[in-house]
Amino acid sequence: MTVYHFVGIKGTGMSSLAQILHDMKHTVQGSDYEKRFFTQTALEKRNISILPFDKSNVKEGQVIIAGNAFPDTHEEIVAAKELNIPVHRYHHFLGDLMNQYTSVAVTGAHGKTSTTGLLAHVMQGAHPTSYLIGDGTGHGVENSKYFVFEACEYRRHFLSYNPDYAIMTNIDFDHPDYFTDINDVFSAFQEMALQVKKGIIACGDDEELQKIQAKVPVIFYGFGEDNDFQARNIQKRTDGTIFDVFVRNTYYDTFKITGYGNHSVLNALAVIALCHYENVDVEAVKHQLTTFEGVKRRFNEKPMGEQVIIDDYAHHPTEINATIEAARQKHPEREIVAVFQPHTFSRTEKFLDEFAESLSKADQVYLCDIFGSARENKGELTIEDLQKRIDGAELITDTTTDVLKKHKNGVLIFMGAGDIQKFEAAYVKEVQVAEK
């Protein structure tokens, strides 16, 4: 019996892939740091063993899948090579796996995870679909027709894939620790486009995506009249969004989604276009769009007394704009309070003015200290450099969250890609203790 051993199983992509293989009746285990990470809940539900790193975890007869964060000098990878066991890097293994299905890669600087989750949910309503989402969610179906997965542009990892279809949500400059500028990012997406086998669904409102060249048809979607799939007559309501879809200027149908903000309409439009191209029944699409409950760490909302708390992964100015816009649509009468933890010194420094501009759209801003990534843990920049660019912004720590209580009817948006949830948890605990 083959055992799939994951080196770094708590990584978001690795966790998802482990779940998929387990659901397909393979034996799966993995190792990682002992610190708890949100992805391990799904692994524990499936009784997938999570071991501390140790070279003795590696045994003959296993298939070793290694996370991208772990170098060839890692003790388990060294042990595998000593035993002549092939080591598969995560993105290469995934690239091979998807070839068994009609595969759809979802990529873009922003909106990947939400769009992947929405597409997987909609496709499941019509056909057996396996999926891998970048929030640590994976699901495998043995007789799948489709394989839907999130494909990340960082370090050009998505070039390991040759999908049947690609949805491209946007091109924007991010990951300044790797990409040099927007042209460098575009070149990565252009190279990816040439590897797609059947068709590309791209946002035509994005100036960079308009320049994409491909060997397959490129279907454009968006709000602009030049798009193949266009959203019109948009009704932004507190219970979701309704819009008409026109295909090449001919009315197609009316759709309702549970999401808020223009970005949610665009994500849905991409899914509608892909489903139209694959002849998925439109009634199934309409139904599934109304039952989508979202993905982890993307506008996850919960009431707490008179306040509303939202947890969101937004860590780029474009994403912060979208999250605040969505909150205002759903809660037009409430005060919007942003609690933001910048992620990486390089990104914060590169987009300092843009962060200030986007955060200023909230009614009040609280800033947590900068979260350094594993690749960098110090920088000359400080959180005060951002604070002084935002009128009235205050600094906050996980021991001073009680200041948030004064926003009696507020929507508190905890945003960031680091450990911002630590601050949210501290505040929830503070409120619960005060209520006793």
Swiss-Prot record:
Subcellular location: Cytoplasm
One Gene Ontology term of the molecular function aspect: UDP-N-acetylmuramate-L-alanine ligase activity
GO biological process: one example: peptidoglycan biosynthetic process
Origin: domain of life: Bacteria
Family: Belongs to the MurCDEF family.
One term under GO cellular component: cytoplasm
Residues involved in ATP binding: G108, A109, H110, G111, K112, T113, S114
Organism: Bacillus anthracis
Pathway: Cell wall biogenesis; peptidoglycan biosynthesis
Protein name stated in the entry: UDP-N-acetylmuramate--L-alanine ligase
Gene3D superfamilies referenced in this protein's UniProt entry, alphabetically: Mur ligase, C-terminal domain, Mur-like, catalytic domain, NAD(P)-binding Rossmann-like Domain
Function: Cell wall formation.
EC number: 6.3.2.8
Species classification: Bacteria, Bacillati, Bacillota, Bacilli, Bacillales
Keywords per UniProt: ATP-binding, Cell cycle, Cell division, Cell shape, Cell wall biogenesis/degradation, Cytoplasm, Ligase, Nucleotide-binding, Peptidoglycan synthesis
Catalytic activity: UDP-N-acetyl-alpha-D-muramate + L-alanine + ATP = UDP-N-acetyl-alpha-D-muramoyl-L-alanine + ADP + phosphate + H(+)
